[in-house]
Amino acid sequence: MMAAAVVRAEVRRQRREERKKMASARTTEDPPENHVVADVACGTGAVTRSSSSSLVVSSSSASGSDESSSASPLSFPVSSPSTAVRSPGSAGVSTSLCSVERMVELSAQSPAADFSVSEAWRFEEAVNMALVACEAVSPYDRFRLIETPDENFLLVTNVIPRESAEVPVLDSSSSGGDSGPEDKKKNVGNKTAGEKNGGGSRAKRRRRRRAPKNDAATPSFLRRHDVLERFAAAAEPLPSLCVHDYALRNADRVTYDGELIYGSYLLYRKAHVELSLSSNKVQHVEAVLRQVYTPGLLDHHNVCDVEALLWLLYCGPRSFCARDTCFGREKNGCPFPALLPKLFYEPVRDYMTYMNLAELYVFVWYRGYEFPAPTPQATTAGGGGGGGSGGGGGAGACAVETSASAGRVDDAGDEVHLPLKPVSLDRLREVLQAVRGRFSGREVPAWPASSRTCLLCALYSQNRLCLDLARDEARTVSYSPIVIQDCAAAVTDVTLSHILPGQSTVSLFPVYHVGKLLDALSLNDAGLITLNL
């Protein structure tokens, strides 16, 4: 027995010496290198690119001391399958970390020939795999690239949970009409105590209503005493917290021939009119860009370059009125900007709806459009104050003159060419490609956004339609008239009204004095329009 124990101890000692020799040889052959790591499960797993040019997915165990309890890593070869795969030292990573120190060291070497192309390709593959892993974990979130003081990059996403509408459950225990067994026991006890104390008659106690147990925590609409009202309250749908989809609907139904059906009025105010006709929307776009890049506001399928998207929407070549007889050509020598819905001229409340509708307008307006090649004259043009490119100090890439005469109308008169810098053309082309890739091959409501008409031309067409309806006695019309709320001085006495039979509703077609509105416009040097009414 003693001899067998001595032999086993000697065998274990020889094995330990062999492991030490193999470890020292491996350390001298392969120096340690930096890794590209991406967290895939909130600290429980990691995707790592080791020095052996492989991508290793490992899972951290609860007990790090026990080697048998740790999960075996799964290797994904990047370039050479024959390369040995080593698991990282520590698999617990709390953030999505992409280290670029190895790339900087290779590129900073003095001889250019020493920079291996295969090493750069392997690094790019590892970074792409890290991005794919992060997107697989959070497919509906957008990641923001932040550089750390250690020359690393973090992929940060929103960690705050999304709000979800909670539907209150209407049951017998929380309502005041029906009572459960516990309520019956309490009522019996109260009745006995009341009879003992001699309080009130039996008829009064029968007419007394029983209150719910948690009256303070119960919503007001659940404390209704009528049974029918409680059923009606349970059937009422709760308002949604945020609207992710946008759809325009005008007419709901037609009951009989001869009825005029109108959609909701398009209400604008004086501030909306001034901003819609101004070619300089820098302040408005800056306010949008100040909050739009906050993680969690947009989805991963939205356009990343929001600044270039808003440039195309507010002051791009296809963002002006397409009518040959636009009032802006006579007033300023350049057509007015096309009219957009009211939400584009107000502070943004729902960024998801705002961005989806903006991408839809850009997709419809620039369908089949390609930017011309840059000319030397356009290269040397400095541009003005950013004409809607916004962005503050770093928005010079999309700079353009903000005056109304900055655009140049071609001979055909169908579009406006603006002096663009060559740096901005690449960004605009990428945005158009991303928007077309999102909406191409899909059925989208293109008819609401297909019209490129300014506000004054839309009011002129509305006046003509109003008079045509009165003359021809149209049978059924689906139309949403424009109403300017605080410009009563521009409304004429000619107003078409229709009283629907059997109802007290009156549908009005307001007729505006377009000439008075045009005379009240004043343009300053910054491209801002003021309506003096």
From Swiss-Prot:
Keyword Iron-sulfur: no
Superkingdom as given in the UniProt entry: Viruses
Basic residues bias (residue ranges): 202-211
GO cellular component, one term: host cell nucleus
Pfam families: Herpes_UL95 (PF03038)
Cellular location(s): Host nucleus
Record field: compositional bias (Basic and acidic residues): 9-33
Region described as Disordered: 1-92, 167-216
Alphabetically ordered keywords of this record: Early protein, Host nucleus
Low complexity biased stretches: 50-82
InterPro entries, per database record: Herpes_UL95 (IPR004280)
Broad class of the protein's primary localization: host cell
Protein family according to the UniProt entry: Belongs to the herpesviridae UL95 family.
Functional summary from the UniProt entry: Participates in the expression of late viral mRNAs. Expressed before viral DNA replication, UL95 assembles at the viral pre-replication complexes (pre-RCs) containing the early viral protein UL44.
Protein name listed in UniProt: Protein UL95
Species classification: Viruses, Duplodnaviria, Heunggongvirae, Peploviricota, Herviviricetes
Chain's gene name: UL95
